[in-house]
């Protein structure tokens, strides 16, 4: 697997992530179970975005010093494009978490605890998936066509799908987990497991955590191939992906109260997936430059938010009238 990642770059990335996770876990441990306020969520979202951009700037500077601008510029642009793709697609994941927490009546104070461990699990699972994907592409380059066709199909499916929380309990996976886990009927504070009559029982909070992890894996199956459309370098794919999901918890609490205001977002994300799928399918006939891909993704997001704002304005006006 060809990569610009040197031991220094890999080590620096690992140190930054470890320090930030340690700070996050330390704050979680000191404060105990509590809901993140909108102000805190906005502050942490800004911290994660700023840290991601600073890392990309340091990455670019390092490559300028070691490889030159001809290498540094496209690689830094690839990181930024991958980060934007993952960040935008992650919003749909946040909406699924909202449905899960609502269906299982998880108190806001406990949602943060679930998401702390959910993000930690996502880091491990996505790292495995990215290195596996990089290896497969290095061995079988035709697999990019499969990724492209899958993203094209997923984009169309996303635009046509209708999801609501009412059917979550009837999903085969949820029924299977409930049937095979020794589980209590109610949430017991912040515990994932409790002991009753000498036996260990999982609580519904553990079921929610499992579903959060599985939902992230499902979304990663979409988002990781999407970044492979930009670059197959495992260092850039992994770092851009993980920096994007590290801010997911703060994004969740930032959007939790206004999710219904983003009714058009799934259509914008669907268009992005279709564009990336087409980009992968035509790669042997025409290579779309990274800068163009970044511009298209950014443009789609801007247009989506403009249309969404107009739709909200019309709805608010109708309700007010």
Curated annotation (Swiss-Prot):
Keyword Transmembrane helix: yes
Main location: membrane
Annotated S-S bridges: none
Regions that span the bilayer: 7-27, 44-64, 90-110, 114-134, 136-156, 199-219, 226-246, 262-282, 287-307
Assigned keywords, A-Z: Cell inner membrane, Cell membrane, Membrane, Transmembrane, Transmembrane helix
Induction: By extreme alkaline conditions.
GO CC annotation terms, alphabetical: plasma membrane
Pfam families, sorted: TerC (PF03741)
Localization annotation: Cell inner membrane
Cytoplasmic side, ranges: 28-43, 111-113, 157-198, 247-261, 308-321
Membrane topology: Multi-pass membrane protein
Protein's GO biological process: cellular response to pH
Periplasmic face of the membrane: 1-6, 65-89, 135, 220-225, 283-286
Similarity remark: Belongs to the TerC family.
Protein role: Has been proposed to be a redox modulator.
Protein name in UniProt: Putative membrane-bound redox modulator Alx
Native source organism of the sequence: Escherichia coli (strain K12)
Taxonomic lineage of the native organism: Bacteria, Pseudomonadati, Pseudomonadota, Gammaproteobacteria, Enterobacterales
